[in-house]
């Protein structure tokens, strides 16, 4: 049993994805991370706020960005329906959350249970977390989960 567990952990380690550098899309909203203000700004323009939680050099973040946020019809749909901001799960920038508490990016990720990247939170207008998507999803599945 121990040999089988060791063999499976070695096999899993052999297929671990390699780090992959990426840039966040230039159309993502530049913000002071005042989430209540960002939610209100989006709502005023008939959009929702989408928060993209990422990790530097995360290959699955790179894939999700490339397939959905960088080019093509998915980007156009997302950009027309959402203001998108990015939060680094290991970042130290201050984030004013919807309850008025200021967290670092990494503290907020922990508070919200973001245990894998990429993760996407869709904010409702009240403001509240309306929807949470954890991990990489293929483009069609991702768009379905966003309701697009």
Where in this protein do the model-derived segments appear?
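N-terminal leader/targeting and pre-domain segments
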Residues: 13-45
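Sec/Tat signal peptide C-region and signal peptidase I cleavage site
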Residues: 8-12
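Non-catalytic, surface beta->alpha helical segment in thiol-disulfide oxidoreductase systems
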Residues: 107-148
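Typically the conserved alpha-helix immediately C-terminal to a functionally engaged Cys/Sec
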Residues: 61-79
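Loop/turn elements at helix/coil->beta-strand transitions in domains of secreted/extracellular proteins
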Residues: 45-49, 80-85, 115-118, 125-129
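Short active-site neighborhood of thiol/selenol oxidoreductases, capturing the structured segment around
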Residues: 44-59
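Structural alpha/beta surface segment adjacent to cysteine/selenocysteine redox centers
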Residues: 87-115
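Bacterial N-terminal signal peptides
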Residues: 1-5
